Amino acid sequence: MAKSMATLDSGTTCSSWNQSGDRLAAGSLNGKLSIYESSTSSSSTFSCTSKVRVSESSIVKIVWLPSEYGDAVACVCEDGSLSIWEELSEDAHGLEWKLCKSMKNKSSQVLDVQFGVSRKSLKMVAAYSDGYLRVFELLNPLELKNWQLQAEFQNVIDSLSTLGKPSSLSASVSWNPMKGEEQEPSFVLAFNSDSPHLNSSKIWEFDEAHNRWLAVAELALPEDKGDPVYALSWAPNIGRPYEVVAVATHKGIGIWHVGLAPDLEGRLPVKKVSSLSGHQGEVWQMEWDMSGMTLASTGSDGMVKLWQSNLNGEWHEQATLEPVPS
């Protein structure tokens, strides 16, 4: 029989587990951030231990920073603002969540944010409603308030395709989670916009020699390049000679293999190996397990589906989890 782990406040709009899975952050319609944790290490029941108002508008996304940078979360709000909050000790008051950094662009809204650890620093990638991507670098690992803009560009392969000011409903960013010390950081980015050039999923890799980001692959068949993308997820890689990335559009979930050896032009070979269907409506979110072997997806139909491939590389639906009426 299923057991409830936590009861979230009514009006909860999003949630996110930290890397160790012992704390849950939840955002609400009223702009409040709530932190849930268990009272003991052996308990599987979580209760709210902290609550702070982040914004006057609703929180639409929460992302935990990598654990080596402390207990901190980034919140994206409906008004397009982005803020970073850190749990700090305040003398007699004990631990409290404090605002470290707030960002708001007058002309565009933040749609998604993700963090990636490079060999030199922590990087933050923020995707905006005007189709631009901004990469920020943390200047001091001990101070989450000091971020420097490192790069700014649109999600297009060549400069001739650079657009004026498109309108984007959503964006999705997913970092390559298993980059080694000797490898450059990379991530995949896609949009759900009115501009076909922006939408398709593109892998961006940092070129340290020239201090710039380069598009090294595009995850879309020729007939699908203009399709809006709803969600992305880059799988952890444990010993595979290729990377695996999941891309969700209105046509379903595409599973892509990305080669590790670039061609003479610096592009990585890509191949779509499977198309998964089963959700009745849009796919909103996808996550891989730690092994990169099982993909979980959820969407507007309220279902959670688990997908796996067999030894022959054929993908299939492994399980479906339905919401339980309250």
Curated annotation (Swiss-Prot):
Main localization, broad class: nucleus
Keyword Cytoplasm among record annotations: yes
Family assignment from sequence similarity: Belongs to the WD repeat SEC13 family.
UniProt GO BP: mRNA transport; protein transport
Organism in which the protein naturally occurs: Arabidopsis thaliana
Protein name, as recorded: Protein SEH1
WD repeat placement: 7-46, 54-95, 105-146, 224-266, 278-317
GO molecular function: structural molecule activity
Keyword Glycosyltransferase tagged: no
Function field: Required for proper export of mRNAs from the nucleus to the cytoplasm.
Keywords: Cytoplasm, mRNA transport, Nuclear pore complex, Nucleus, Protein transport, Repeat, Translocation, Transport, WD repeat
GO cellular component, as recorded: cytoplasm; nuclear envelope; nuclear pore
Localization in the cell: Nucleus envelope; Nucleus; Cytoplasm; Nucleus, Nuclear pore complex
